[in-house]
């Protein structure tokens, strides 16, 4: 499993988890966040490995569909990048303005 895909699915899961069913949340969380194998999940929930695989693949598609419609993750990435650029600019050009730096730091803390 490619690390980029794992990171993307985890990020999408962070944004869209409340929109998933309990089973989808459980399987995708165990597989991507907790690094369980398909076999381990299947054994724990007394279902076939194929059933787990199908559920995870279907959930991945659902997460990608949510993102294609809502763009929450993409917008978060763009906002984070712009905030980083702003902070860098302010530190380079307005380092003496402590109030400005404080306000930017407050914005950064809202992302967490």
Swiss-Prot record:
Lineage, top-rank taxon, reads Bacteria
Q: Name one Pfam family in it.
A: UPF0122
- NCBIfam families on file: PRK00118.1-4 (NF001068), PRK00118.1-6 (NF001070), YlxM (NF045758)
PANTHER family with a match to the protein in the record? UPF0122 PROTEIN CBO2450/CLC_2298, UPF0122 PROTEIN YLXM
* Biological role stated in the UniProt entry: Might take part in the signal recognition particle (SRP) pathway. This is inferred from the conservation of its genetic proximity to ftsY/ffh. May be a regulatory protein.
Similarity comment: family membership: Belongs to the UPF0122 family.
Q: What is this protein called?
A: UPF0122 protein LSL_0628
Origin species, per record, is: Ligilactobacillus salivarius (strain UCC118)
Native organism taxonomy: Bacteria, Bacillati, Bacillota, Bacilli, Lactobacillales
């Amino acid at each position: 499993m490619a690390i980029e895909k794992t990171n993307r699915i985890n990020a999408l899961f962070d944004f869209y988890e409340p929109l998933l069913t309990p089973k989808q949340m459980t399987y995708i969380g165990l597989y991507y966040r907790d690094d369980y194998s398909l076999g381990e999940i299947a054994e724990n929930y007394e279902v076939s490995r194929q059933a787990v695989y199908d559920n995870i693949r279907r959930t991945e598609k659902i997460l990608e569909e949510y993102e294609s419609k809502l763009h929450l993750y993409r917008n978060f990435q763009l906002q984070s990048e712009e905030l980083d650029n702003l902070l860098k600019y302010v530190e380079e050009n307005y380092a003496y303005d402590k109030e400005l730096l404080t306000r930017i730091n407050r914005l950064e803390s809202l992302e967490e």
